[in-house]
Amino acid sequence: MNLKSVSVSQIRPEVSEILVPGEDIIQCFQTVRDQVLFTSKRVFVVNVQGITGKKVSYYSYPYSKVQYFGIETAGVLDIDSELVLVFSDGNRLQFDFKAGVNIKGICAGISKYIL
């Protein structure tokens, strides 16, 4: 599913308990149930599972472990954009964003923390 931009007030309340002091949420995105947060220290993924949504997984991907990343901007027929992050351990994350999301802004934000 494609991610759409949401405000910080729409993130799951328990996320604030997991962030470390001095860590700021820069951008937030979500699908129907899952969320992806770009903070000043990491990419944080909230994966809501099951029919009731009571089971939730939290994944932290620190910028310090990003080996490289790339973006694919929206085109004429393909209006969605994409971000790929590759980590030093070989793991790869791919996020697809709905039309209208500033993928270049996300790229600039990540660059600020990993370069």
Question: Locations of the language-model features?
Answer:
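Phosphoinositide-binding peripheral membrane targeting modules
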Residues: I18-Q35, T39-N91
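Anionic N-terminal interaction surfaces
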Residues: M1-V36, R92-L93, K98-G100, K104-G105
